[in-house]
């Protein structure tokens, strides 16, 4: 198959890059290892049997319009509805299991954070609709990238081992640098570049999220905003992510136990421990969720590498390809981690994709 441009990854950055190339009239293909689009944007509806009309984000969730105006502008352009994070009420602080959590007036964050009506999947779905279906190849894990004359050849492998080859003149890396470093490059990329990529933290990689959905809005009845900070766990940071006008409560928490420790118990046991914590915090109203989910990003091979489990979480910008060597003008990193301003954030995915595609169109693309 031929295409002027090959995008590796169908997360936010890859999909947005596709829409920009589509508008520019450039031939392209998007190769995605997973059997779905969205990358680190993931809804509970995709995970398992979410009740109709309810959307819960198991991955990237928030944006900050005041400091991320380009992302906010895209949300507006796509006709999506921002939801302010939080609601009126007190927050809780859990110090120990032997005494009730303490209530405090909730503080107002600045800048204010927002979610999207319909979850962040509303964003990826809107971007996907702007791309012809045949240009997105799911279940195509890239295993190697080779220089081929003046062009490039990309080899992929499906879950069943079926291989495919794609050729183009440029590759956009819309996946975490640590995952890009696991691919085979022929000729080899400079080791200093690969080493830097391997050590670049992947945002979300160490995290696990738990979400519980309830049939009643008990937070309002208890005059709570849903924000909790806990020194007990297993969840150390908890937020209300309910959608307006549903009459339901959706609560999510970051599980604070390190990945290799939480893997010593079953998912069912981890869910039980999370439910017990919610009962301690909110009472028997939280004992029996209508639905519950856990997404452990550390166990996702298309997100996390062993390096991610060995280092602190952070926002570190990886190196791009050296401009003077044989790979010059052949590869561009556009995943969120490559954003100089919002590395690791949703806005960073838009920022890096816009910068990378714009530079290629202005300075590299053949007329």
Locations of the language-model features?
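N-terminal FAD cofactor-binding segment of flavoenzymes
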Residues: 61-89
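A conserved short coil-to-beta-strand element within the FAD-binding core of flavoproteins
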Residues: 138-153
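Conserved flavin/dinucleotide-binding core of flavoenzymes
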Residues: 4, 13-16, 24, 45-47, ...
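N-terminal glycine-rich dinucleotide-binding loop that anchors FAD/FMN and/or NAD(P) in oxidoreductases
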Residues: 44-72
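Glycine-rich Rossmann-fold phosphate-binding loop(s) that bind the pyrophosphate
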Residues: 9-11
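Short beta-strand to alpha-helix junction loop
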Residues: 62-68, 108-128, 137, 265-268
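Glycine-rich FAD pyrophosphate-binding loop
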Residues: 22-49
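Central helical "cap/lid" subdomain
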Residues: 158-223, 285
């Amino acid at each position: 198959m031929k295409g002027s441009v090959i995008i590796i990854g169908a997360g936010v950055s890859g999909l947005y890059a596709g829409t920009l190339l589509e508008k520019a009239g450039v031939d392209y293909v998007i190769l995605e290892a997973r059997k779905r689009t969205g990358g680190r944007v993931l809804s509970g509806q995709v995970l398992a049997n979410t009740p109709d009309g309810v959307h819960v984000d198991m991955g990237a969730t928030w944006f900050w319009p005041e400091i991320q105006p380009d992302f906010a502008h895209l949300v507006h352009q796509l006709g999506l509805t921002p939801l302010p994070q939080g609601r009126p009420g007190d927050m809780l602080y859990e110090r120990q299991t032997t005494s009730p959590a303490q209530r405090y007036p909730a503080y107002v964050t600045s800048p204010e954070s927002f979610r999207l009506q319909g979850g962040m999947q509303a964003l990826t779905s809107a971007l996907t609709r702007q791309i012809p279906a045949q240009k997105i190849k799911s279940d195509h894990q890239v295993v190697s990238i080779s220089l081929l004359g003046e062009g490039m050849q990309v080899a992929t492998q499906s879950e069943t081992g079926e291989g495919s080859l794609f050729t183009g003149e440029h590759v956009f890396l819309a996946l975490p640098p640590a995952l890009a470093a696991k691919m085979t490059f022929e000729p080899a990329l400079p080791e200093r570049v690969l080493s830097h990529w391997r050590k670049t933290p992947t945002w979300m990689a160490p995290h696990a999220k738990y979400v519980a959905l309830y049939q009643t809005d008990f937070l309002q009845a208890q005059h709570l905003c849903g924000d909790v900070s806990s020194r007990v766990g297993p969840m150390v940071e908890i937020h209300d992510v309910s959608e307006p006008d549903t009459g339901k409560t959706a609560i999510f928490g970051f599980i604070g136990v390190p990945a290799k420790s939480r893997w010593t118990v079953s998912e069912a046991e981890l869910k039980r421990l999370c439910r017990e914590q919610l009962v301690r915090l909110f009472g028997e109203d939280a004992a029996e969720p209508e639905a519950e989910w856990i997404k452990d990003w550390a166990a996702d091979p298309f997100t996390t590498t062993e390096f991610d489990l060995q280092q602190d979480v952070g926002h570190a910008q990886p190196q791009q390809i050296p401009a003077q060597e044989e790979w010059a003008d052949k590869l561009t990193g556009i995943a969120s981690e490559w954003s100089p301003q919002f590395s690791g954030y949703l806005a960073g995915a838009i920022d890096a994709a816009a910068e990378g595609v714009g530079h290629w169109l202005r300075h590299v693309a053949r007329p």
